[in-house]
Amino acid sequence: MDNRFITIEGLDGAGKTTITHRVSKYLNQYGVTDILTTHEPGGTPVSDFLRVLIKYGGPMNEPINSISELLMIYAARLQLIENVIKPALSKGYWVIGDRFDLSSQAYQGGGRGIDILLLHALSNKITNTLSPDLTFYLDISPELSISRINHRQKLDRIEQEPLSFFDRVRSCYKKLASERKNIITIDATQSLEEVSMSIYRHLDWWFLRPQE
């Protein structure tokens, strides 16, 4: 079976990491054994170093400008693309990504309000035509997101943003999903089993049993 690139998107607490692993196990049942899962930001030594800066800031609590944040995210993404994702796809692997470029459009574009032209220029340069075959957007409200992540020992810089920030992020996600046929919106307020089954049905239709 040819390689595929599938990404999972949404607010923190939506269940992205769990669903990423469930999708991998489901594909295994259909004979797809060459699977690589990734997460952003991170996934290479350089990307993981940048992840710490992005999520927790630099030494001495130096403030991080929103453009600096954006550039670090794209630097981490470029390392992941060139050193992990592209090599895996070239070998015929299916890559399942916990976040990709859509996160930047939603968080830095929608949440931070960064100019869309700058975002598009960076996206085009860094991803260089690499685009997911299919994206699942796990939709939950900011209120539910916050309630789900509050148990974490330490919230990162972005997780500590006010509710209005996540309202903008969610609105941007929903707008982008409405404009692109390969972004499937999933109601992630459902139980984990219901969310999983909904995603499995879409995987069947798109890739596994398209003839039925």
UniProtKB/Swiss-Prot annotation:
EC number, as in UniProt: 2.7.4.9
Gene Ontology molecular function: ATP binding; dTMP kinase activity
Keyword Transferase tagged: yes
Biological processes per GO annotation: dTDP biosynthetic process; dTTP biosynthetic process; dUDP biosynthetic process
Reaction equations catalysed: dTMP + ATP = dTDP + ADP
Binding-site list for ATP: 10-17
GO CC field: cytosol
Keyword GTP-binding among UniProt keywords: no
CDD domains: TMPK
Name of one Pfam family that matches: Thymidylate_kin
Matches recorded under InterPro entries: P-loop_NTPase, Thymidylate_kin-like_dom, Thymidylate_kin_CS, Thymidylate_kinase
Keywords, ordered alphabetically: ATP-binding, Kinase, Nucleotide biosynthesis, Nucleotide-binding, Transferase
Similarity section: Belongs to the thymidylate kinase family.
Family annotation (NCBIfam families): DTMP_kinase
Described purpose of this protein according to its UniProt entry: Phosphorylation of dTMP to form dTDP in both de novo and salvage pathways of dTTP synthesis.
Protein name, per record: Thymidylate kinase
Species assigned in the record: Blochmanniella pennsylvanica (strain BPEN)
Primary gene name: tmk
